[in-house]
Amino acid sequence: MSVTNLSWLKKKSQSVDITAPGFNPLAGAGKQMPQASKPPAPKTPIIEEEQNNAANSQKHPSRRSELKRFYTIDTGQKKTLDKKDGRRMSFQKPKGTVKYTVESRDSLNSIALKFDTTPNELVQLNKLFSRAVVTGQVLYVPDPEYVSSVESSPSLSPISPLSPTSSEAELEKTTTPDVVHPKEPTPSSAFTAVRPVRVVSSTSEEEEAFTEKFLKINCRYITSSKGTVSGVLLVTPNNIMFDPHKTDPLVQENGCEEYGIMCPMEEVMSAAMYKEILDSKIKESLPIEIDQLSGRDFCHLKKVTRSNTDELDSRIRDAANDSASTAPRSTEESLSEDVFTESELSPVREELISLDELRHDKSSGASSESVQTITQSGVECLAVISEAASTPDHLKSGSGHTANEVGTLSLKTGLNNLEMPTKEGDQAADNLQKISGLKEQSTGIKKDNQDFPLDENSLHQEEVEKESMPCGEAIELKQKQVVDKGKQGREQNQDSETEVEELRKLWKSHSMQQTKQQRETMQQVSQKEIKHKIATADIEGSALLKEKRRHRLHKFLCLRVRKPMRKTFVSQASATMQQYAQRDKKHEYWFAVPQERTDHLYAFFIQWSPETYAEDTGEYTKEPGFIVVKKIEESETNEDSTNEAAAREWEVVSVAEYHRRIDALNTEELRTLCRRLQITTREDINSKQSTPVKADLESESFRPNLSDPSHLLLPDQIIKLTKHLPPRTIGYPWTLVYGTRKHGTSLKTLYRTMTGLDTPVLMVIKDSDWQVFGAFASQPFKVSDGFYGNGETFVFTFCPEFEVFKWTGDNMFFIKGDMDSLAFGGGGGEFALWLDGDLYHGRSHSCKTFGNHTLSKKEDFCIQDIEIWAFK
């Protein structure tokens, strides 16, 4: 008893560590098989107890392994890796993309620019969580050689169509009607079915909605002096940007810096779409392929008209040659078909009526009415025959076709657009001839044994025959008589065969009578038609030419902005300086936009209109928005505005610009009304009285204090110059720091007098022709390795009238000081103003920096006197 209790206690207290590295529950089972062959050994109580413990530990090894698998806590790293690998395997390559490996100096923006796309699109294609990329990373980028198919998703981007999931593909397979329906699933098959793997699509609905928030348009940027380049216009709710194509010849010649521009949307004052460009300077730089129709298209148009007339001539000639055989055969075949009931004919009647209405729209009134009368009467005759022959069983059993097929075959001549093999017509005709006993009457009919559809010539010939029939009314009367006979045949079914025979003879005799007349008239009709078509082709050619000129492939978008657009391929400082240089110019930018994208632009600007948000409050929102300008709001006082309004298709303006135009329009209308009523306003009185006072005040305010009297400038010339000086010079006295009368003619002396000076300087030159001109420098003159200065620099001349030429923004060539020369402006190897080391010889030429003409009378001049003034 004690031994048994002891063994039970040992069994209860003993445990096995299943997590131990040396534990193997199957090891005992594996060793148990070879031990069974050994002879049994004498058992002691201790050995028996150990064997019982081993047997208990081996009873449920599978259960313990399952518990270990489901309840063991691990780190989860392997599971996470497997899940990531599965997701990576299920991510499909988007259509229209290629793999690109990120290089050391690449960024997401540079990659997007390299493949003509946007960074947002790359983020969407590759499912990126940030814009950071690392070297060696593989990205999917748009394939430039990919052509999107019709089945691709209609998104703005030609790439990244939606890829269907595998479950959707399975659903499409099961719902396809052509596939045999599978058997009903059994309960066991429901558990054995493999669960479909979820495939990550290339885009989602949210991302598609995001891509619709901007427009990406391939267009051309038209400049006044730098030509026309092709590129991409990107319009977003915040910015408008144009990126030129690197492959454009002008871009390769001048660089991207000249054509890449960007502007915030809040700076846009108006956006208008024009049919043509009104600015003469812009219009001169417009390429020929955009401005007018090329001569190659006109020659192609002539070839098309000639080919059309030749084709028409051949068709009519072939129809005239075959008129004798085609007309009887077609009419015979149309009546030698199996008969059918009126209920089966009703859908064919409806189809015939609709086709006759369509033909009535295409052809003239008289000819279409005759064709319609003949075809409808023919249908009535067929209906009578079918009703008369519907009772006998041997007639019903003689048909080898369905009702729809027979209806299509019998209406071949009336519809003029269906194709019918002659073999089927022969079978139907033979069946009807066997039934009615009319074989001997049809021996003279010629029929072919080959299967061929009705060609275009025969269809055209049949249509000409029907239009040229002079006895349509007689045919209608004869067919009415046949209709009356058919009504009597309803009561007497045995007379149906006789009526079929009479109707066959009627059509055959009529067609034979018409053959001679048609042969004679076909030649006249063909000649008249050829002459008419040639004249029509010439008229259509000229009309098409005018129509193509009026509706060109391109229309012109004009953007007017408050400040000049910033260059995107230059540094921030250079872009700011260029904006400052163009501050006094008219800020208009022209783009040649494809005609099909004009509506997209209009809809985009209308989408950001503030009207929907301002209706309830009655106040205009501060958010940037646009308002459509109506033509009745435009001023029509002068001819220029009328021409502009006629050429403009639509225009949207900002809220501020809209109110400014309304105020200006109201003010102008009020002034016009006052002039018409001869009413003097207070503004007119004040303007008349204060004109001399204001002139005196302006002259006093702009007249500076000079340290020394000037020998080169007159007082009025000083005032004119002062108005164009930068604001930082206003209020400072003019100090003479160098003059040839005081310091001599030496460039080195000039540099020495400028030492330690930190103000702008004004150089005035008088040449041997007594002409005064000069330059304003933003910094004192000095010896430099390259050009220096900023956009405040300009050149001027009083020869013959006062003109100022400020920085154009084309380049940064302002001032260049050498030991033997001093130059202003540059570009193309020419300087706006150049002086030698002795300050005796000089040269002036037009340059790109200032856009000036020659400042002196002659390009080469001799210096008579020089004055340099500083502002301190």
Curated annotation (Swiss-Prot):
Residues 549-576 are annotated as: Mediates oxidative antimutator activity. SMART domains: LysM, TLDc. Residues 212-268 form the GRAM domain. Residues 98-141 form the LysM domain. Residues 711-872 form the TLDc domain. The keyword Membrane does not apply. Its main location: mitochondrion. Residues 1-86, 150-187, 314-338 are annotated as: Disordered. Residues 63-86, 170-184 have a biased composition (Basic and acidic residues). The modification Phosphothreonine is found at residues 118, 341. GO terms for cellular component: mitochondrion; nucleus. Keywords: Mitochondrion, Phosphoprotein, Stress response. One of its GO terms (biological process) is response to oxidative stress. Belongs to the OXR1 family. PANTHER family: NUCLEOLAR PROTEIN 7/ESTROGEN RECEPTOR COACTIVATOR-RELATED, OXIDATION RESISTANCE PROTEIN 1. This is Oxidation resistance protein 1. It comes from Bos taurus (Bovine). The gene is OXR1.
